[in-house]
């Protein structure tokens, strides 16, 4: 939907968004006939993270991307990556110039990853097909100073963090700033402007529900923190150790006193809630003490499995954030046997692509 890979096309932005809204209305007409709440993205400079292959020809390296499904045909970037955040656009040519001037930094470099924030903080990861030496580290330190970015070097069984491997992002929801540690290897929402709109939408939608909240797939606490203001207690589950550590840091950093994190999968949580088995990870958590009114899910692209569908259908209120409309439609076919859709939103996380991020509020019939 773009003329070139990685290039924004603001003149066509509204048309592509209208097309997504139309496709969403048609796909979900069996479940929702009302208006879809459409949340647009900035038309350019919206991606806070990006990764590039490094294509090498002779003594020169280039940034390269791939068309979907054509992963053996790299396209070298000879134009500005205008979907990228301003900080990424600023870093890319400066980094390339320094790398190409240094055989030590350039040789066997095969991938570069950028992670940035709305305040201009950044981590830049250089990934190599070679062991990283003290000499490399010395040049990488100079690179970090020159670019004012945190540098990480990665190779097989090697990770060298020169200063830190994370950034701290601040998003403001209902007038309250929330600060998030975003770790270089962890999942974060790539479009900060749209992420903030998603958080605000979820907070507004749950403003009067009360009771306790259970959240599955909580990640680094992205939704957990602002949603905690609307509930008495929050129990959030996450399987990734890295994400759990980040979530615990973010909870403490933001002074949220009513959130408990449990490192377990949705399947394990179902077993615990049903009393099928006991988990040492829950030894300090009294599940019977919770009065769950609402469940929040933001699953991976595969959507919810049957057991998790059955689990969340117990709750009076369901907030479902989906990155895959097809699996959302499949899940709604079952969830709408017990619940009805009250609100439906479309978030344009990835302009100029076919990707559609959706949010649905369901209440028990």
UniProtKB/Swiss-Prot annotation:
Judged by the first EC level, this protein's enzyme class is: transferase
Tell me which residues this entry annotates as catalytic.
323 (nucleophile), 357 (proton acceptor)
| GO terms, molecular function | rRNA binding; tRNA (uracil(54)-C5)-methyltransferase activity, S-adenosyl methionine-dependent; tRNA binding
* PROSITE patterns to which the protein is assigned, alphabetical: SAM_MT_RNA_M5U (PS51687), TRMA_1 (PS01230)
Q: Does the keyword Glycosyltransferase apply?
A: no
Q: Which InterPro entries match?
A: MeTrfase_TrmA_AS (IPR030390), SAM-dependent_MTases_sf (IPR029063), TrmA_MeTrfase (IPR011869), U5_MeTrfase_fam (IPR010280)
This entry's Enzyme Commission designation comes to 2.1.1.-, 2.1.1.35
Q: Which UniProt keywords apply?
A: Methyltransferase, S-adenosyl-L-methionine, Transferase, tRNA processing
Protein encoded by which gene: trmA
Catalytic activity from the UniProt record: uridine(54) in tRNA + S-adenosyl-L-methionine = 5-methyluridine(54) in tRNA + S-adenosyl-L-homocysteine + H(+); uridine(341) in tmRNA + S-adenosyl-L-methionine = 5-methyluridine(341) in tmRNA + S-adenosyl-L-homocysteine + H(+)
Kindly indicate whether the keyword S-adenosyl-L-methionine belongs to this entry: yes
What does the organism's lineage look like at the top? Bacteria, Pseudomonadati, Pseudomonadota, Gammaproteobacteria, Cellvibrionales
List, alphabetically, the PANTHER family matched: TRNA/TMRNA (URACIL-C(5))-METHYLTRANSFERASE (PTHR47790), TRNA_TMRNA (URACIL-C(5))-METHYLTRANSFERASE (PTHR47790:SF2)
Q: Which domain of life is it from?
A: Bacteria
* Binding residue positions for S-adenosyl-L-methionine: 189, 217, 222, 238, 298
Provide the family line: Belongs to the class I-like SAM-binding methyltransferase superfamily. RNA M5U methyltransferase family. TrmA subfamily.
Any one GO biological process: tRNA methylation
Q: Can you name the source organism?
A: Saccharophagus degradans (strain 2-40 / ATCC 43961 / DSM 17024)
Signal sequence bounds: none
The record's disulfide annotation reads none
Function of the molecule: Dual-specificity methyltransferase that catalyzes the formation of 5-methyluridine at position 54 (m5U54) in all tRNAs, and that of position 341 (m5U341) in tmRNA (transfer-mRNA).
Q: What is this protein called?
A: tRNA/tmRNA (uracil-C(5))-methyltransferase
Could you give one GO CC term from the UniProt record?
Answer: cytosol
């Amino acid at each position: 939907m773009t003329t070139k890979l990685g290039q924004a096309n603001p003149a066509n932005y509204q048309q592509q968004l209208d097309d997504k809204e139309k496709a969403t209305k048609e796909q979900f007409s069996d479940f929702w006939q009302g208006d879809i709440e459409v949340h647009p993205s900035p038309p350019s400079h919206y991606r806070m993270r990006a990764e590039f292959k490094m294509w090498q020809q002779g003594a020169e390296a280039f940034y390269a991307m791939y068309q979907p499904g054509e992963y053996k045909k790299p396209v070298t970037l000879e134009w500005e990556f205008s979907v990228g955040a301003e900080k990424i656009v600023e870093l890319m040519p400066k980094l390339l110039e320094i790398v190409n001037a240094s055989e030590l930094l350039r040789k066997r470099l095969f991938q570069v990853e950028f992670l940035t924030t709305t305040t201009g903080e950044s981590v830049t990861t250089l990934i190599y097909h070679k062991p990283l030496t003290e000499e490399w580290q010395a040049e990488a330190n100079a690179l970090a100073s020159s670019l004012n970015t945190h540098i990480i070097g990665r190779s097989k069984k090697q990770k060298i963090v020169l200063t830190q491997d994370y950034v701290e992002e601040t998003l403001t929801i209902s007038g309250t700033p929330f600060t998030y540690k975003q770790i270089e290897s962890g999942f974060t929402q790539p479009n900060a402007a749209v992420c903030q709109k998603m958080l605000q939408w979820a907070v507004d939608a749950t403003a009067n529900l009360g009771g306790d909240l259970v959240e599955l797939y909580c990640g680094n606490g992205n939704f957990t923190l602002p949603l905690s203001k609307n509930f008495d207690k929050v129990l959030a589950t996450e399987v990734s150790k890295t994400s759990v550590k980040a979530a615990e840091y973010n909870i403490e950093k933001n002074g949220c006193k009513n959130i408990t994190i449990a490192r377990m999968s949705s399947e394990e949580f179902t077993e615990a809630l049903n009393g099928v088995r006991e988990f040492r990870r829950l030894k300090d958590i009294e599940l019977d003490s919770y009065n769950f009114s609402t469940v929040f899910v933001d699953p991976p692209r595969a959507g919810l499995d049957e057991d998790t569908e059955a689990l969340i259908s117990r709750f009076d209120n369901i907030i479902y954030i989906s990155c895959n409309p097809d699996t959302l439609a499949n899940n709604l076919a079952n969830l709408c046997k017990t619940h009805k859709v009250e609100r439906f939103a479309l978030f344009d996380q990835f302009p100029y692509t076919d990707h559609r991020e959706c949010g649905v509020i369901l209440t028990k019939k």
